[in-house]
């Protein structure tokens, strides 16, 4: 009887822990999807020479990438964040072509 109670307790504990972790993984995926979407928009505008609009989308992508990285620590996301920051910095200087390259590199990591 004790063995059954221990198993039941262990199962309940495992299910409880899983239910706490699953929402954070789902939120990380949502933020990552938003980061990817904004990064693609940044790239499209960068290819058209619109550095200011690229920066706007890269900043939105960065916000979501940071939230995704907080929810689920990932080296690829961190690298994507680094490139998004470079895209923003370069885009603010009006260099759309170079900023686009950084945004494309970020997309490859997100």
Regions found by a protein language model. Give the residues of each.
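Bacterial N-terminal signal peptides
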Residues: 12-21
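Long, charged/polar, soluble alpha-helical segments
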Residues: 2-6, 21-110
């Amino acid at each position: 009887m004790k063995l059954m109670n221990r198993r039941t307790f262990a199962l309940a504990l495992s299910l409880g822990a899983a239910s706490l972790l699953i929402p954070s993984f789902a939120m990380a995926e949502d933020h990552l999807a938003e980061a990817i979407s904004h990064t693609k928009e940044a790239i499209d505008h960068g290819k058209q020479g619109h550095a200011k609009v690229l920066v706007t989308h890269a900043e939105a992508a960065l916000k979501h990438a940071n939230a995704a990285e907080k929810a689920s620590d990932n080296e690829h996301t961190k690298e994507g964040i680094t490139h998004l920051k470079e895209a923003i910095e370069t885009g603010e200087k009006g260099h759309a072509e170079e900023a686009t390259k950084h945004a494309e590199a970020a997309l490859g990591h997100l």
